[in-house]
């Protein structure tokens, strides 16, 4: 089983960051990993028990993960686990923890865990997939940070006048 953790400081309060991350209508405004993201099974907003489908960019295999929110506690914590069985993933789960750190900033910690398939190739696939997923997650969180840096009124952001 592979594990990883990536942390980024965002120039916004945890409530704002949490809301943007789980707004599927706006997800592709900042998420560099995905080519599509939507709530599924009639869900109209992220919540405990809601399902979502996120499909990676083609250069990463274009794999679609269908997940269910197992925890949804705004603005602190959200966690999902994989429901489908796409190529190369036997299991997959992730959490996003948000913490206000003062001066209008927050810390986002993304933790993931997965098993690769086929089982006979886990010893090769998990280290490789883990490195790629950690790098892509770091890239995603940096893009999220830049998204908040560009908003009016942010330090280094667009001026309001």
Task: Annotate each PLM feature.
Residues 1-44, 159-161:
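Hydrophobic ligand-binding cavity/cleft-lining segments
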Residues 3-5, 62-67, 89-94:
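Short, surface-exposed coil-to-beta transition loops
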Residues 7-11, 38, 68, 81, ...:
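Generic structural detector for well-ordered beta-strands
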Residues 19-26, 130, 146-150:
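Short, intrinsically disordered, mixed-charge
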Residues 38-87, 103-107, 139-161:
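Glycine-rich portal/gate segments that line the openings of hydrophobic small-molecule binding cavities
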Residues 82-135, 155:
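Beta-strand/loop substructures that line and gate deep hydrophobic ligand-binding cavities in soluble
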């Amino acid at each position: 089983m592979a594990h990883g953790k990536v942390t980024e400081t965002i120039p916004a309060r945890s409530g704002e960051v949490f809301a943007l991350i789980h707004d599927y209508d706006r997800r592709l405004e900042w998420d560099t990993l995905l080519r599509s993201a939507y709530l599924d099974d009639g869900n109209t907003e992220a919540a405990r028990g809601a399902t979502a489908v996120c499909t990676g960019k083609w250069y990463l295999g274009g794999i679609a993960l269908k997940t269910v929110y197992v925890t949804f506690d705004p603005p602190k914590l959200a966690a999902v686990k994989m429901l489908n069985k796409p190529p190369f993933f036997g299991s997959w789960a992730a959490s996003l923890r948000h913490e206000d750190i003062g001066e209008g900033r927050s810390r986002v910690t993304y933790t993931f865990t997965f098993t690769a398939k086929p089982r006979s190739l886990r010893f090769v696939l998990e280290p490789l997939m883990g490195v790629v997923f950690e790098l892509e997650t770091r890239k995603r969180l940096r893009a999220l940070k830049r998204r908040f840096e560009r908003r009016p009124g942010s330090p280094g952001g667009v001026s309001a006048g």
